[in-house]
Amino acid sequence: MTNESRKRKVRGSQIRSSRGDKKQGRSQSRDDKEIERLERQNDARGQESSTHVDEGFVPEEQSFIETESVNRVESRMERWLDVGRPVHLIGPTGCGKTSLAMHVARERDRPVVWINGDAELTTSDLVGEYAEKERISEHDQFIHNVVKSKDIIRDRWVDNPLTLAVQEGATLVYNEFSRTKPVANNVLLSVFEEGVLELPGKRGKSRYVDVHPEFRTILTSNSVEYAGVHEPQDALLDRLIGIYMDFYDLDTEIEIVRAHVDKSADTNVEDIVRVLRELRERLDITVGTRAAIMANEGATTVDTVDQAVLTDICTDVLASKVAQRSDVRGLREEIESAIDDMEVALS
């Protein structure tokens, strides 16, 4: 017996694919090719709309005041954005972080994408997920009076803000960044370091997205002593440029408040801003520029603002910051004392 014949001889049973397995494999291969063909066909017809940046979900631009103090912080932010570094604005609530972030983002003349962080935000909320069903259809009437129809229904991936910003080269404004749990923000590590966004949960070769060279990020956070603030992990903080903000100087705050109130009723703006700044020093609660804007809005509803009216207005504006009703009395007394000590001349 030759070696060739010995090699061909097989003892025992052989394991072969069943006819059913072979048929199923051929069927699966045909289905995959059919889906690819229909996708190309639908793309050519424009049946599938691509996701793109929609700035309709970005907060409207508010009046923005340019002063020396504002320009100083703005220039620092732009310096780092110009070299592609993400900027993290940190400061007390109501000091103007969000307004400044939105202004700087719009000045870049690129699309702006907005995210508002909170404890319930997940990685999927940032990058996207399979959240819809799509139908791929083919209708063929090659023969007269004979219509061939085929529908394939499958999961459809929906891009969320971070993915859209990365793809389009937009400026991402991530407001209240530190209110999001750190695990959800892990996806930012590869974006800032390797220039690649990984889409957890996405299948196939499109799981990775190259970061557009014009993509930039501005994050805003309250200081860590505020309730509901999570401290980001060191690996991420190591890749951020941190710029700490405080409340603006008196002249800047006056100009900001004037820009937000009726011009015909701004005679008390300076006095009210001074009172709120004094309360900022005296009280254990945060008294921001936003509180001064609200107080001046309240003052525009009366003909004359005397000390009693101003006390009521300031108490109403700040009462939501105290823990319980019994604390309001002490708050009111502090406000009355500050107004008396400053000898505010109201009209």
From Swiss-Prot:
Any one cellular-component term (Gene Ontology): gas vesicle
Question: Which superkingdom?
Answer: Archaea
Q: What is its EC number?
A: 3.6.4.-
Spans of biased composition, class Basic residues? Answer: 1-11
SMART domains membership: AAA
Q: What class of enzyme is it?
A: hydrolase
Task: State what this protein does.
Answer: An ATPase that functions in gas vesicle formation. A minor component of the gas vesicle, also found in soluble extracts. Probably enhances gas vesicle formation. Gas vesicles are hollow, gas filled proteinaceous nanostructures found in several microbial planktonic microorganisms. They allow positioning of halobacteria at the optimal depth for growth in the poorly aerated, shallow brine pools of their habitat. Expression of a 9.5 kb p-vac DNA fragment containing 2 divergently transcribed regions (gvpD-gvpE-gvpF-gvpG-gvpH-gvpI-gvpJ-gvpK-gvpL-gvpM and gvpA-gvpC-gvpN-gvpO) allows H.volcanii to produce gas vesicles. A similar region restores gas vesicle production in H.halobium without the p-vac locus, but which still have the c-vac locus.
Please state what the protein is called: Gas vesicle ATPase GvpN1
